[in-house]
Curated annotation (Swiss-Prot):
Function: Catalyzes the hydrolysis of S-adenosyl-L-homocysteine to form adenosine and homocysteine. Binds copper ions.
PANTHER family named in the record: ADENOSYLHOMOCYSTEINASE
UniProt record similarity statement: Belongs to the adenosylhomocysteinase family.
Enzyme Commission number, as recorded: 3.13.2.1
Sequence positions that bind substrate: 57, 132, 157, 187, 191
GO BP of this protein: one-carbon metabolic process; S-adenosylmethionine cycle
HAMAP family in the cross-refs: AdoHcyase
Protein name stated in the entry: Adenosylhomocysteinase B
Enzyme class of the recorded protein, top EC level: hydrolase
Catalytic activity: S-adenosyl-L-homocysteine + H2O = L-homocysteine + adenosine
SMART domains xref list: AdoHcyase, AdoHcyase_NAD
Native species: Xenopus laevis
MF term (GO), any: adenosylhomocysteinase activity
Keyword NAD: yes
Amino acid sequence: MSDKLSYKVADISLADWGRKAIEIAENEMPGLMKMREMYSESKPLKGARIAGCLHMTLQTAVLIETLTAIGAEVQWSSCNIFSTQDHAAAAIAKTGVPVYAWKGETDEEYIWCIEQTIYFKDGKPLNMILDDGGDLTNLVHTKYPQLLKGIKGISEETTTGVHNLYKMKSSGTLQVPAINVNDSVTKSKFDNLYGCRESLIDGIKRATDVMIAGKVAVVAGYGDVGKGCAQALRAFGARVLITEIDPINALQAAMEGYEVTTMDEASKEGNIFVTTTGCADIVEGRHFENMKDDSIVCNIGHFDVELDVKWLNDNAAKKINIKPQVDRYLLKNGRHIILLAEGRLVNLGCAMGHPSFVMSNSFTNQVMAQIELWTNTDKYPVGVYFLPKKLDEAVAAAHLDKLGVKLTKLTDKQAKYLGLDKEGPFKPDHYRY
């Protein structure tokens, strides 16, 4: 362990810039600052050695410093080869937190970075996992199974990682209790929807400077992420087509006025394509061949499996790199495809990801999940769990003052009529918002 690097980032001299930007982000993240205020004295995460695998951004820097402020030891890697913000990584590394992340990692470097977070400086292994997408969870289960007994819990950030946890649970391979942070209302209905509604356009515009108004945009998937993307593209003046497998989501899209069709049909009409599904093989070779000249293709789902990038690389007559994370392919039919971020997350590959305020919702849930799993271990046998509704409401409440929201309070009579506690929870667990 003595040979282990204390950190590896692109450029440690970016730390001062990163620190200034982190201070601005803190002001937009009231939920995380509330966590520090509530728990910095009691330090409920004392003794926790958290290995984190989540986009190393300015917002994540605020999360990391919140975890350390309330007692945890933390080591970090990014969950995407393009998503690290190098000034944020440098700023955190300079504080002494081991960070292994830089923008533009190779796939091999990516795995190396994750592996650096498994053992801490004194040779002791991780005892908590904070994951985004499941790569750290899977690595520990497959390559370091001897460590699983000592791990108290996993908190998982995103839809793809949650799917992975449920697959592991059903196959009997999950060995650690996990909290599904993604499906907290204050995560999925805010980060996934409102975060993507802003950061998708940011990524497309920074990458291409394309005029969206008047274009035909195709959004694959109409879950919370797809809904946010469709709203944004429509607001900029695009005519939006939706593809869906789920009849409920398809009906929702149709009732919102979107045309719902198949990718085989939509690929002939679209100018801009966005995949949001978390599934594989959404845009395949035949779809690329159908597309108009200079169609822009990108993905905002977690992994790069939604677009058949291998087909493009194997079958295009020519590939020209326009600038980092923007490639223009000449197909054999004479038309071009513009691919963003190599088919990986466009909002983080080509822009700065979600704004700080909406990430404060998500990351406050992460902090609560880590505290819950660490301090109430006996409550959680191996399985996948949700945070209680009361905590979900507390996350939302922590963000209201920043927006100038004035909340109505129930009277005793009203609370009795509804059969509720005046302080909540206000909705049953099955309520869908």
